[in-house]
Structure formats: C-alpha cells, structure tokens
Amino acid sequence: MLATGYGEQAALQTIKAANVDSEMGRVVVACVNSPASTTLSGDEPAVLYISEMLRSAGVFTRKLKVETAYHSHHMENVASSYLKSLQGLSSTEIRSDVEFHSSVTGRRKTSDFGPAYWVENLVSQV
C-alpha cells in the first residue's frame, strides 16, 4: 500500500496513465484520506511502479508497513471466511445520540451494520 500526496481524481488519472494492469497487476485507490491525500493498494510491482512515477513528478509517496493490500482485490480471497466469522456476532443497540458515518459510502449510516456491511468495508474503497 502506498500513501500519496494526490487527491482521488489525480490518483485515478495516474493509475490509468501507468497502464499497469496488463503487465504488473492491478492498483486501486483504496482510501480517500482528504482532498489531497489517497492511499493506493494492489499488486506490489504495480504499486511500486506508480510510486516511482509519482516521486519522479515530485509527488509525496510513502510505502506503508503492511503485509496485505487492504481495500483491494487481495481482500476478496478472505471475504467469505471473514463473513462466516462475523455471522454469529450481534451488534449492540444503536444510540440515536451518536452519529455513525460510513467509511464506505461517506454518508451517515443508521442501520444494516450486519456482516455484509463489514465485508464491503474490507474489500471496498474507504
């Protein structure tokens, strides 16, 4: 995973311009941290290639010290076992005085916090 000093649109344009899907693997915008900060995730050769592209253009990058490409296609391998492990859990009652904003949708969320939501959070952009 790679933290960048690029916003979402600039990061998406860079991924498209890199044209890495065919040779080096896939890269996605995993996290939109702010209007000027994203985290990329995916296949390491492609992520490293894009990192060099960005550095050459003077854009901040930092490789994250993680062993897994979270919020990418890599998480699809564990999604079903994650779903099964969450099946028996129940959530506590939702408090109306506390607002929850979904990192998946970016909007306020008031219901449907079941296992499927947390799997979506695992495999999707946040």
Residues covered by each model-derived region:
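Short amphipathic alpha-helix segments
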Residues: 3-23
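Short beta-strand
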Residues: 27-33, 63, 93
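Helix N-cap motif at beta-to-alpha junctions
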Residues: 8, 42-47
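Generic recognition of flexible, low-complexity loop/linker segments
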Residues: 25-28, 88
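Acyltransferase
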Residues: 2-3, 12, 55-126
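A generic structural motif
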Residues: 36-41
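Short amphipathic alpha-helices in soluble, non-transmembrane regions
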Residues: 15-18, 47-57
